[in-house]
Curated annotation (Swiss-Prot):
InterPro entries reported for this sequence: AB_hydrolase (IPR050471), AB_hydrolase_1 (IPR000073), AB_hydrolase_fold (IPR029058), Epox_hydrolase-like (IPR000639)
Keywords of the record: Oxidoreductase, Peroxidase
Organism of provenance: Rhodococcus erythropolis
Similarity comment text for this entry: Belongs to the AB hydrolase superfamily. Bacterial non-heme haloperoxidase / perhydrolase family.
AB hydrolase-1 domain span: 22-254
Gene Ontology MF: a single term: peroxidase activity
UniProt name for this protein: Non-heme haloperoxidase
Entry's EC annotation: 1.11.1.-
Catalytic residue positions: S95, D225, H254
Pfam families linked: Abhydrolase_1
Length: 274
């Protein structure tokens, strides 16, 4: 399997398919690059080069006991980009991966980034603070941490079968395969990485990163996202990025890249080609 060694020696797994213009994908917590299957296949079949890595401690990347913070996540992405010699890249991030994209573009992307896409992304800041009163109370994330410690396997089943894909909504078209694949990805990763990653995605303030992004940016968000509520994420982020456009998807969930892949893929392709 292909790996790149990050600056601190951590082995980062990546996929690299196709030979056209590069599109790089950044997955969400606590998943892996496999979460992008629908997008990778869709774009590689249309002549694009697609790259997706597993975040440290996630998927097939090394389960190291350190560096589970957004600065390391962005630096690891930069190591993949440098290793492959990528330029003119469109970076696509979902959820926590959207935060990774924001920090990567702001700190490492000069001269290499063509466009950015943030899907159901956590920026600018998830947790409630004095300066972010509309954020989610820290007790929400304390509950996540407790669930990871107590019974991570059951917690991941509950997330996937409930709010992540909107399977808890009346009339939802529930897919056991989607649920099991989410659980499989989560349980492949490191419990420590996932535990510490909760702080990374919930308490990192991306305001300055968003302001530093100077490439065309598409922000995509479902208005029934129960994991990253749209009001304090996408609707704020679009006001901070200089050249951003927000597309809202009525009734769609946090997991729309999987359960509404046709819709997401069509809009993603349109933005890439614009």
């Amino acid at each position: 399997m292909p790996f790149v060694t990050a600056s601190d020696g951590t082995e980062i797994f990546y996929k690299d398919w196709g030979s056209g213009r590069p599109i790089m994908f950044h997955h969400g917590w606590p998943l892996s690059s496999d979460d992008w299957d629908s997008q990778l296949l869709f774009l590689v079949q249309r002549g694009y080069r697609v790259i997706a890595h597993d975040r440290r401690g996630h998927g097939r990347s090394a389960q190291v006991g350190h560096g589970h913070d957004m600065d390391h996540y962005a630096a690891d992405a930069a190591a993949v980009v440098a290793h492959l010699g990528l330029r003119d890249v469109v970076h696509v991030g979902h959820s926590t991966g959207g935060g990774e994209v924001a920090r990567y573009v702001a700190r490492h992307g000069a001269g290499r980034v063509a466009k950015a896409v943030l899907i159901g992304a956590v920026p600018p800041l998830m947790v409630q603070t004095e300066s972010n009163p509309e954020g989610l109370p820290v007790e929400v994330f304390d509950g996540f941490r407790e669930a990871v410690v107590t019974n991570r396997s059951q917690f991941y089943l509950d997330l996937a079968s409930g709010p992540f894909y909107g399977f808890n909504r009346p009339g939802a078209d529930i897919s056991q395969g989607v649920i099991q694949n989410w659980w499989r990805q989560g349980m492949t990763g490191s419990a420590q990485a996932h535990y510490e990653g909760i702080k990374a995605f919930s308490e990192t303030d991306f305001t300055d990163d968003l302001r530093a992004i100077d490439v065309p940016t598409l922000i995509m968000h479902g208005d029934d996202d129960q994991i990253v509520p749209i009001a304090n994420s996408a609707e704020t982020a679009v006001t901070l990025v200089k050249n951003a456009r927000l597309k809202v998807y009525p009734g769609l969930s946090h997991g729309m890249c999987t359960v509404n892949a046709d819709t997401v893929n069509a809009d993603l392709l349109s933005f890439i080609e614009s």
